[in-house]
Design a protein with these regions (language model features):
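Glycine-rich short-loop/terminal segments
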Residues: 5-117
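Short, surface-exposed beta-edge/turn micro-motifs
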Residues: 80-84, 120-122, 147-149
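Short HxH-centered metal-ligating active-site micro-motif
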Residues: 96-146, 155-156
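Active-site or metal-binding loop neighborhoods of secreted/extracellular toxin and effector enzymes
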Residues: 28, 40-41, 49-50, 150-181
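Generic structural hydrophobic/aromatic packing signal, biased to beta-strands
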Residues: 84-86, 93-96, 142, 150-152, ...
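Short, flexible beta-strand-to-coil junctions
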Residues: 87-91, 129-130, 152-160
Length: 181
């Protein structure tokens, strides 16, 4: 005997999986990818501004463009949360992540397989609301997730970019360090 699942249960299950009401974008699809992380309480205009960050490109030889740094710090100050970008080696924004005022939780990195490579080919660029240096959590994420680079842009009181702090993974060394800031 076949059991039918009522549509209401399907809708509830879908709402639990995707609280925003939207399915995640298909891989390789044309839809604008979702913003990950702590997006509850954001206005639709703020979510739209965060989604537009996916359209930005960074020259592969640069860490960040001045325009992108300003866009990141302005939205971060407005929503009073850290905002992070995962950028690949080609300069394409692959994920936009919203955190709390103190930290971001990096999205699932399964699509960036390590394989034989030592690093994932992804750099994390995020904001710090108090214009502070990289935290121990940032350095731990850098080392354990095998990111190419971890950078934090300080947000000044007027929303402009402040100092930029960065760290990268170092090869095996006598001191036993895994990162260098």
């Amino acid at each position: 005997m076949k059991r039918l699942i009522p549509c209401e249960l399907l809708r509830r299950g879908r709402a639990l999986l995707y609280p925003s009401g939207r399915d995640p974008p298909p891989i390789g699809g044309r839809e604008i990818p979702s913003v990950f992380g702590n997006t509850t309480g954001l206005k639709s205009s703020q979510t739209a501004r965060l989604e537009r960050l996916y359209r930005r490109k960074v020259p592969p030889s640069e860490l960040v463009t001045p325009e992108l740094a300003r866009a990141l710090t302005e939205i971060s100050r407005e929503i009073t949360r850290q905002v992070g970008l995962l950028i690949d080696r080609g300069g394409t924004v692959r994920a936009v992540v919203v955190g709390t005022d103190r930290e971001i939780v990096i999205a699932d990195l399964d699509q960036f397989v390590l394989g034989r490579k030592k690093l994932r080919g992804i750099r994390c660029l995020h904001t710090h609301l108090k214009d502070e240096a990289l935290t121990s959590d940032d350095l731990t994420d850098l080392a354990l997730l095998r990111l190419d680079l971890m950078a934090a842009i300080g947000v000044l009181p007027d929303g402009l970019p402040g100092r930029i702090f960065l760290a990268h993974v170092v090869p095996p060394n006598p001191e036993g360090r895994t990162t260098e800031a």
